[in-house]
Amino acid sequence: MKVAVIGGGPSGLVTLKYLLAAHHFQPVDPIEVQLFESEDRVGGTFSYRTYDRAELVSSAQLTTFSDYRWHDKSVDYLSAVEYVEYLEGYCDRFGLRPHIRLSTQVEKVERTGKGKHRITVSHKGQTSTWDCDAVAVCSGLHVKPNIPSIPGLDRVPVVFHSSEYKHVRQLGQNTNVMVLGTGETGMDIAYFSVTADSTKSTTVCHRNGFVIGPKRLPETKLFGRVTSKTPGKALPVDLSRPYLFVNSYVHRKVRGALQTTLSRWAVKAGSWLVTGTTRGFDQWVGSLPKDKYDESHYFYCKSTKAMPYISAPYRSHSWVHRLRSSIVQAVLPDTGSRKIDLAPWPEYIDEDGVVHFEKNSRPDSKVLLQERRFKPDVLVLATGYTQSFPFLGSEYCTPDQADQRGIWRTGDASVGYIGFVRPSFGAIPPLAEMQVQVWVLNLINRLPGPLVADDSYRLFSNPSGRIEYGVDHDMFAHRLALDIGSAPSFFQALAHGWQVIVFWAMGGTLNTKFRLVGPWAWSGAPRIIHDELLDTVTGRRSTIDLLVALCIRIFQATSVVSSRPSKGDSEVTENRG
């Protein structure tokens, strides 16, 4: 079998690795694979669309692949530079480089008959073709910048997309900076702007609200005393959901919509407890409207550094807030006199370069209009990316048409889309690893059986929403593990010792857990759990962390009991040990 992989980012590299390794785990002949990457090095967006001081918002423990870990176990979040270094090491560790063709642009993918495909590529002006049996599209979500249509955009002296941002120097001297977009990159750039001595003002524009979620469990003060066991090293949020009740033993009637809704209620309650607002973490302004508080709009922004500068003018000073904060309060930075103005989306920019904003009744809109007319000197478009597959013919489906776990379309498993789902809290690379495990087994006819119809891992989709590929990270990873029989049961985990069973039950949904059993079982998985991952359960949870986790577990356990199935119902758990 011959397989082409398009794209040399994390999803492409992990796809290449599993294709090359398949014959070591399954009784099949070696697969011939070529990976085509248009740039001159691997890493994808992390190599070419990142910036100074950029840091991943998903933890190193979650983001790194199951069988190759970051060398420094004390690091929770990798910089973009470190992550590219990690991916380079991944290539070396598994001997991927001989199968990677860099600086090679895929021009066309077409069918040749009998289920095969022809890849046309160009390299240094030379065009060539390669015929294969299957194609893995791993070109990623962040390639073609999305440029909004705003009349008069060219009347701002400096305008560029966030994909071009590299350093705070680009924001200029004594400038009024405007950032369009409230995703992680937009918030990062706003933070760099407001804390730079060179800029005069910073304004962030949003379309219709956003939700801030911390990437670490917040450090808190209880009656004025910091409760964290390790100040500055609070547990990453994406490691904090216990696998036992989040996935393994949650009744089918509680899974999906109800489970996600209840979890979000708990998050909102926790946010109020430590910051005084339910809109988001320390988010006193810019919230989503009530009719938009559904999962299709509810992708957290996990860059929190800018929010204190946005919230400063809006924080409550009521006696209730003062009383609450005197008892328990998240540790927040002192912003001094610096602030970030929040504004509605620009409607147009007039001949004088003055921005005219869309009119609404939001508090931030009223404050901005009262203060001044705004004339930006620098405008950064942190407006995301659009999906584009110019190399695919019309006979091929697109990721949104891939109805089998977002990987392939029914009846056409020879074309797989890896890494095109977006988790609300989580990371794309580990989900790509789980997706490719399923896809490769299907290619070689080694899937245990047909995929069970199950959409409980999907975030609700709103017909008017822009994002249609959202998933709950933990539930999706677990579903993929169930598909291939790699979700370990209690007794299968217990067979590896008490450390493994503790992490299996109370640790996060990390892919190494799914290498204990199943078609991709790996003997090194228990060692990684013991040496690295167990610490996320036993080493860094404060008193408040444990109390909150205990409440959630009691609630989830109660949900299981109250939803106990009738006799003969075999789906309380899908783990078969």
Swiss-Prot record:
InterPro entries, per the entry: FAD/NAD-bd_sf, Flavin_mOase, Flavin_mOase-like, FMO-like
Any one Gene Ontology molecular-function term assigned to this protein's record: N,N-dimethylaniline monooxygenase activity
EC number(s) on file: 1.-.-.-
Domain of life where this protein originates: Eukaryota
UniProt cross-references to Pfam families, sorted A to Z: FMO-like (PF00743)
Pathways per UniProt: Secondary metabolite biosynthesis
Entry cofactors: FAD
Enzyme class (EC, first level): oxidoreductase
Gene3D superfamilies recorded: FAD/NAD(P)-binding domain
Keyword Flavoprotein attached: yes
Keywords: FAD, Flavoprotein, Monooxygenase, NADP, Oxidoreductase
UniProt keyword Nuclease present: no
Family affiliation: Belongs to the FMO family.
Protein function: Monooxygenase; part of the gene cluster that mediates the biosynthesis of the indole diterpenes penitrems. The geranylgeranyl diphosphate (GGPP) synthase penG catalyzes the first step in penitrem biosynthesis via conversion of farnesyl pyrophosphate and isopentyl pyrophosphate into geranylgeranyl pyrophosphate (GGPP). Condensation of indole-3-glycerol phosphate with GGPP by the prenyl transferase penC then forms 3-geranylgeranylindole (3-GGI).
Protein's name according to its UniProt entry: Monooxygenase PC-14
Organism: Penicillium crustosum
Origin organism lineage: Eukaryota, Fungi, Dikarya, Ascomycota, Pezizomycotina
Gene coding for it: PC-14
